[in-house]
Amino acid sequence: MTTIEPPPAEQIKKDIAQIQQWLTATPHLPSVEDEDWLETIHRNCKFRLEKTKSKLDAYFSLKGKHPAILRDRDPLAPALVTARSAVTLAVAEQLTTDGSLLVYHIHQPDHSLLNAADYYKRIVMLHDVILLERLAPNGVLFIVDFTHFRYQHFLKIMMHVRALVEILVSCYAEKIKAAYLITESELVVQMIKLITKLSPQKMRERVKLHGTSMSKMPREVDEEVLSNDLGGKGPSLAHSEEKTQQLLEKYRDWFLEQDRICENLAKRSKKELKESFKKLEID
């Protein structure tokens, strides 16, 4: 991946001040005092002012459009605790040799525990924490295990999936290096085809189907970082999942505060509403 040389520190500071002024001057958007958070988003947007503004607009605006995923985000809420048992969602504690962050999604056998909105809510919360902690300096690499995925999972997972894609593409700008999907199920393959149709072409090109044999995974990722549950030498998935939950809980107050920060639709023009989110882009 080509390294983006950041502008001089003074220029970044001016950019952040301009973004804050823009937020304050835009009637339907809230003011934001957290300069570090804004700088991280700006960095992920490769220091492009207009792209940063677009991501921020979507970030606050989509809360009203998709409240099932973007509101009531208490990591200790009973529903989100149950979601931990449905899908093991975890980040590796160590970066790969090229500075990428491994993010695991391991679907568990008991489909009765799965609620798509709660699972997607935790995904988006994790993306926020990745931003806040600056965990992915060189992008994100997903490993999604569908070994236990069945038709009952499929029926649930497709609920809200269009909303999730819109949120991730419109609001977040982490570099997605690749998504390894562990499966030998034709059902999963067809589901992925449906989902990727909603995604930009660049994202589709980064989806890699991987069989259930883990023999090649350490060579394709980073053996030292990859979980020992998947053939690597890194910590167990259970250990990484617990650490990830602790990270989410660390920002519990922040998540609760964010519930009160969203756009004011009454102050947004009808033309803006009509033209918003027509174009989805990904780096």
Walk through the language-model features, giving the residues of each.
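Basic, amphipathic alpha-helical/coil surface patches used to engage anionic, phosphate-bearing ligands
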Residues: M1-D283
